[in-house]
Amino acid sequence: MIAAMGQHGHDPIAQFIRWLDDARRLRIPNYEAMALATAARGGKTSVRFVLLKGIDERGLVFFTDARSRKGRELHGNPRASLAFYWQGKGRQVRVEGSVEEVTPAEADAYWPTRPRQSQLAASASHQSARLRSREEVLARFARLARILKGRRSPSPGVLDRVSRAS
């Protein structure tokens, strides 16, 4: 309802970018966090928080593990809803639409920008999978860290998928 509020014309994307920039400038914690709602083919819904990683002419960009529940749901039903809320500003933005993967080259370009710890964590765990124990994942993480000895983890390929919602 941005346009209905008379905020800066009738371009909701431009208004969203202004509000996002305001939240960043005001150092609102987790200003880039968004609730992502997906639905399985049968209609069962789920929601979780992910981070906005960019905005381009095709939409909003976020990254996820293709094997996770959200990755599987987006593959089977490529529609989603997103919601941002900036506490203290009384602002929220809701986005609904289709989701698509970007090219493998775009996904590969993102991987090296992730902090090393995040790379290791993504490679050591299978998001949304049941764990036998926390120690199991910590052991995998430590083993990868030893093997790579300070180098960045190579992109695991299928582990990370870049999705766009528009």
Short names for language-model regions:
Residues 1-166:
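Binding-site signature for planar aromatic cofactors or substrates
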